[in-house]
Swiss-Prot record:
Structure-specific nuclease with 5'-flap endonuclease and 5'-3' exonuclease activities involved in DNA replication and repair. During DNA replication, cleaves the 5'-overhanging flap structure that is generated by displacement synthesis when DNA polymerase encounters the 5'-end of a downstream Okazaki fragment. It enters the flap from the 5'-end and then tracks to cleave the flap base, leaving a nick for ligation. Also involved in the long patch base excision repair (LP-BER) pathway, by cleaving within the apurinic/apyrimidinic (AP) site-terminated flap. Mg(2+) 1 binds at residues 34, 86, 158, 160. Residues 344-395 are annotated as: Disordered. It comes from Aspergillus niger (strain ATCC MYA-4892 / CBS 513.88 / FGSC A1513). This is Flap endonuclease 1. It is an enzyme of class 3 (hydrolase). The gene is fen1. Residues 1-104 are annotated as: N-domain. Keywords: DNA damage, DNA repair, DNA replication, Endonuclease, Exonuclease, Hydrolase, Magnesium, Metal-binding, Mitochondrion, Nuclease, Nucleus, Phosphoprotein.
Length: 395
């Protein structure tokens, strides 16, 4: 799930933190990818007539189809992917996972009912809600990656947190995930939409944490508190706290402790905090997650030549993939993994830090932009109000 509406908050209040560009812009870069999030998206997106792809024996193959061709696309564009798989979820996450499982169980029942009585749209809608990544999906994807020569590692708990460790250490350029909570784990750069299909024509979003913090005017701890207020995987949200309210509360009070104190003492009692709301534990999971050091031997990885006969056996003979396409993909892997060894020029130069004057200028421009947006909203609200108060038929 990640952090609710965090992208909206950053795009509106720290627009300089986000760059949108073509996948080709990342040529020669190593990227740590949240494997579980990718597999989940493949199971949802790689479909035929609303149903997941199946082999002749009735086994799901959407995850393998997605993993093979989306990874190929990255390698074709000079990217060197490293997949990171989730370990055991933190205890605090078990409540959220239980809720998700209950929702999926309800969706499964609704899906069966829709197949009997509903429209094609109903069937597809409920079918997507029943999706969950199983151990078998993970095991098969690991087998496929090994045959492709693409490295993977297992995280002790959250994959996004381990991706962030590797990015901070400079072992990879960025962490790639659709989950915005990857920023809470302090990845310097987050890439989104990297594992999307080419047909979707979605640009790759590149989000820089330091620019987001600068634009929001927060330190990392305040940013984490903001994310907890917005709604994260570890806690249920506080009712009536949307993105604008969450941002205002943290800016006004500076920390979750002070925000909760304000809510407690508010005579209007506008906000009701859930009885069991261990925000300190959630904050600790973001600040000090269970991860391996980047220099741990289990975090070593390298790209190798694909095992073509092994790929044919697994994908063609076992899973019913097209043999010519698999062999063609293996040839592209061999060729493009070599060309991705070329270094990017940026690796030879250290980035120049912004001067205080440049920072002040950027902040001024950002503040002006925010003021313009506020002014525009006020004018729109005023025009709406005037239109409502105008008698019907008045020109």
């Amino acid at each position: 799930m990640g952090i609710k509406q965090l992208y909206q908050v950053i795009s509106e209040n720290a627009p300089d933190a986000i760059k949108a560009g073509d996948i080709k812009n990342h040529f020669g870069r190593k990227v740590a990818i949240d494997a579980s999030m990718s597999i989940y998206s493949f199971l949802i997106a790689v479909r035929s007539e609303g149903q997941q792809l199946m082999s002749d024996t009735g086994e799901t193959t959407s995850h393998l189809m997605g993993m093979f061709y989306r990874t190929l696309r990255m390698v074709d564009n000079g990217i060197k992917p490293l997949y990171v798989f989730d370990g055991a979820p933190p205890k605090l996450k078990s409540g959220e996972l239980a809720k998700r499982f209950a929702r999926k169980s309800e969706a499964t029942e609704a899906h069966e009912e829709a197949k009997e009585t509903g429209t094609a749209e109903d069937v597809e809608k409920f079918s997507r809600r029943t999706v969950r990544v199983t151990r078998e999906h993970n095991a098969e994807c690991k087998k496929l990656l090994k045959l492709m020569g693409i490295p993977y590692i297992d995280a002790p708990t959250e994959a996004e947190a381990q991706c962030a460790v590797l990015a901070r250490a400079g072992k990879v350029y960025a962490a790639a995930s659709e989950d915005m909570d990857t920023l809470c784990f302090e990845t310097p750069i987050l890439l989104r939409h990297l594992t999307f299909s080419e047909q979707r024509k979605e640009p790759i979003q590149e989000i820089h944490l330091n620019r987001a913090l600068e634009g929001l005017g927060m330190d990392r701890k305040q940013f984490i508190d903001l994310c907890i207020l917005l709604g994260c995987d570890y806690l249920e949200p506080i009712p009536k706290v949307g993105p604008n309210t969450a941002l205002k509360l943290i800016r006004d009070h500076g920390s979750l402790e002070k925000v909760l104190e304000f809510m407690e003492n508010d005579p209007k009692k506008k906000f009701v905090v859930p009885e069991d709301w261990p925000y300190e534990d959630a904050r600790e999971l973001f600040l000090n997650p269970d991860v391996r050091d980047a220099n741990d031997p289990e975090c070593d990885f390298k790209w190798e030549a694909p095992d073509v006969p092994g790929l044919v056996d697994f994908l063609v003979k076992d899973k019913g993939f097209n043999e010519d396409r698999v062999k063609n993909g293996a040839a592209r892997l061999q060729k493009n993994l070599k060309s991705a060894q070329q270094s990017r020029l940026e690796g030879f130069f250290k980035p120049v830090a912004r001067t205080d004057e440049e920072k002040a200028s950027l902040k001024r421009k950002h503040d002006e932009k925010i003021q313009e947006q506020k002014k525009k909203k006020k004018e729109e609200a005023k025009a709406k109000k005037e239109a409502k108060s105008r008698p019907r038929g008045a020109g």
